[in-house]
Amino acid sequence: GKRVPVPEGFSAGARCLLESLNVFLSALAIMEQQGTEVSLASPGTWPLTPELTAECFLEAQPIFERQAAIWQNVLEDRADNRELEELDGFINNTSIRLRLICKETAVELPGDMYADCWEKHEIPPCTLVKLPHHGHRDSITPHLLDMLAPKTVVISVSNTRTDDCPAASVLQMVREKGCALYVTDAIPDSNGHVSNHLAIHFDI
């Protein structure tokens, strides 16, 4: 499949986007070879089983149009470092925000969306929310937590991350709201010790 160059002189964020695009292009080529049906996501509600429904939410169209224009320039060998840095600043807000509903249980899966983006919407309460962006400091706000009112909060994060994920301020915020908190990797204490921790597993 097609690959795009990753110029040494580009910023770290721009290079990361180009490397990610190459991973995506490789996966897309494999799916096409296998005859996999691929389509653009669109907002809507879909019954998955008689009891399970999926709701898909996307941000307004201009953000996707800008993203598409930048990627088109890359694919046509006109990659621009400044454009890619611009994209790096908003690409997380192009995430699909997915809500799974089964009877009285609602699970909110907001991708990597920044809190100041999706808290602008009227969002009904949920049973569980997986925090965006590995629990980074910009993943949640008190207002958003009040609106969602989750019983359980899940943070998907690796112990190898060095960018303050999950952020101590986020952990404190969630605990102060009285939510049950689960983290996929144990969080080292102040002495660097990693203890056993509760894990969470879904069967759908």
Regions found by a protein language model. Give the residues of each.
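Flexible, acidic/histidine-containing loops and adjacent segments that form or flank the divalent-metal
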Residues: 1-107, 179-187, 191-204
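Short Gly/charged-rich anion-binding patches and loops
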Residues: 23-26, 140, 169
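Active-site-proximal loop/helix segments of hydrolase catalytic cores
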Residues: 69-166
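C-terminal regions of proteins
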Residues: 143-149, 154, 161-204
